């Protein structure tokens, strides 16, 4: 149990620090009345043209998910490319299988029209 003491101490310190950082702003804040102008969106000194929490097109969400997936692909390819001279054929073909699966997924999304902005 003694080998877990540093982990427990750091966990307790981080929890205490988090609680302190959550409580201190409430202690030092002033309880002034809030005006509707302070709660509205600020648009460079002009009156707001619309609601700040407006809906956005679902295609933006889809493109962001696709970006994250293919960005993670690059993070997997970088260590593979750095150690390319040291890996054997199994490492090469496993990465080619990974690339094939991602390419099939990309072609599927392209075929379904996920990347079209009509």
UniProtKB/Swiss-Prot annotation:
It is found in: Mitochondrion membrane. The keyword DNA repair does not apply. It comes from Oenothera berteroana (Bertero's evening primrose). The keyword Mitochondrion applies. It holds the Pfam family Oxidored_q4. Keywords: Electron transport, Membrane, Mitochondrion, NAD, Respiratory chain, Translocase, Transmembrane, Transmembrane helix, Transport, Ubiquinone. InterPro entries: NAD(P)H_OxRDtase_bac/plastid, NADH_UbQ/plastoQ_OxRdtase_su3, NDAH_ubi_oxred_su3_sf. Core subunit of the mitochondrial membrane respiratory chain NADH dehydrogenase (Complex I) that is believed to belong to the minimal assembly required for catalysis. Complex I functions in the transfer of electrons from NADH to the respiratory chain. The immediate electron acceptor for the enzyme is believed to be ubiquinone. It is a multi-pass membrane protein. The chain crosses the membrane at residues 7-27, 62-82, 87-107. The gene is ND3. It is an enzyme of class 7 (translocase). GO terms for cellular component: mitochondrial membrane; NADH dehydrogenase complex. It catalyses: a ubiquinone + NADH + 5 H(+)(in) = a ubiquinol + NAD(+) + 4 H(+)(out). Its EC number is 7.1.1.2. One of its GO terms (molecular function) is NADH dehydrogenase (ubiquinone) activity. This is NADH-ubiquinone oxidoreductase chain 3. Belongs to the complex I subunit 3 family.
């Amino acid at each position: 149990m003694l080998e877990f003491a540093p982990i427990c101490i750091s966990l307790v310190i981080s929890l205490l620090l988090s609680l302190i950082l959550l409580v201190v702003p409430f202690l030092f804040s002033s309880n002034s009345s809030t005006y509707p102008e302070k709660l509205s969106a600020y648009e460079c000194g002009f009156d707001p043209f619309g609601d700040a929490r407006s809906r956005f097109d679902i295609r933006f969400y889809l493109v962001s998910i696709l970006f994250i997936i293919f960005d993670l692909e690059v993070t997997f390819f970088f260590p593979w490319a750095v150690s390319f001279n040291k890996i054997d054929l199994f490492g090469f073909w496993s990465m080619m299988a990974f690339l094939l699966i991602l390419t099939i997924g990309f072609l599927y999304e392209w075929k379904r029209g996920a990347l079209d902005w009509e």
